[in-house]
Amino acid sequence: MRNSRKVLMGVVVSDKMQKTATVKVESKNRHPFYHKLVISHKKYHVHNEEGENAAKVGDKVLIMETRPLSATKRWRIAKIIERAK
């Protein structure tokens, strides 16, 4: 069942909270009438473990859906794909 969870890729835009990061996920959709590519984005609060494995601002991360961890957190960082330079 663990593999049936939603997985998204995004960029960490804030890590100022304890054990929480804000990740911006962009999605590209085609407009139904004009057929133009429309880029939309959404921000998620994700669980970010402290220590060496913690994601920093600018990191490209893979986030996975999980049980509710707080009032706004339902995602956790599954993997850090690329570190910020």
UniProtKB/Swiss-Prot annotation:
Keyword Secreted: no
Keyword RNA-binding belongs to the record: yes
PROSITE patterns in the cross-refs: RIBOSOMAL_S17
Keywords on record: Ribonucleoprotein, Ribosomal protein, RNA-binding, rRNA-binding
Gene Ontology cellular component annotations, sorted alphabetically: cytosolic small ribosomal subunit
SUPFAM superfamilies: Nucleic acid-binding proteins
Residue intervals passing through the bilayer: none
Record GO terms (molecular function): rRNA binding; structural constituent of ribosome
UniProt cross-references to CDD domains, sorted A to Z: Ribosomal_uS17
GO BP: any one term: translation
Summary of the function given for this chain in its UniProt record: One of the primary rRNA binding proteins, it binds specifically to the 5'-end of 16S ribosomal RNA.
Assembly description: Part of the 30S ribosomal subunit.
Similarity comment: Belongs to the universal ribosomal protein uS17 family.
Stored HAMAP family: Ribosomal_uS17_B (MF_01345_B)
Protein name in the entry: Small ribosomal subunit protein uS17
Source organism (scientific name): Mycoplasmoides gallisepticum (strain R(low / passage 15 / clone 2))
Lineage start: Bacteria, Bacillati, Mycoplasmatota, Mycoplasmoidales, Mycoplasmoidaceae
